[in-house]
Amino acid sequence: MQTSPLLESLMEALRCLPGVGPKSAQRMAFQLLQRDRSGGMRLAQALTRAMSEIGHCADCRTFTEQEHCTICLNPRRQQNGQICVVESPADIHAIEQTGQFGGRYFVLMGHLSPMDGIGPGDIGLDLLEKRLSTEAISEVILATNPTVEGDATANYIGQMCGQYGILASRIAHGVPVGGELEMVDGTTLSHSLAGRNPIKY
């Protein structure tokens, strides 16, 4: 079936979004054109501005329109002494929603993966080391993903912290709240057993 070249271009562009295949892109394109052209225009303007104006924080590397993000500029967080290392800006959002962390962050934008040719310099570990050597940091909390690559990255950073006498800790991994043991995979259950906590009375 012949369709408009512009429509084809729109559907192809929408496929760059994660989880969007040809059918989903087609539905989105027709929805915008048939029922929500004003929404489509707002989306286009927001995308154009975001792509051209959002960069990376000079300190933690998260997304921001300024040279430094609001978290890094917060005096209370600067005095906290803790840095939480995460793989992506989305991880910061998830941790901030808990309200349990009051320090600053460092975003790797990935993890170590020798098989893919991703080394320490590719995920900004030279910048992290500079912070470790120049700032008053009391603890580095390693919140990389519980994968082989995430664990390897955490171990590498942990050794780096040791060179500067800085405490490094790894976030706990285990059985999710409300989960049933029979539904938990073996690796997660192993982590839960190894990282068990004493009951305090």
Swiss-Prot record:
It holds the Pfam family RecR_ZnF. A zinc finger (C4-type) spans 57-72. Residues 81-176 form the Toprim domain. PROSITE patterns: RECR, TOPRIM. The keyword Phosphoprotein does not apply. SMART domains: TOPRIM. Keywords: DNA damage, DNA recombination, DNA repair, Metal-binding, Zinc, Zinc-finger. GO terms for biological process: double-strand break repair; recombinational repair. GO terms for molecular function: DNA binding; zinc ion binding. May play a role in DNA repair. It seems to be involved in an RecBC-independent recombinational process of DNA repair. It may act with RecF and RecO. Belongs to the RecR family. This is Recombination protein RecR. It comes from Yersinia pestis. The lineage of its organism: Bacteria, Pseudomonadati, Pseudomonadota, Gammaproteobacteria, Enterobacterales.
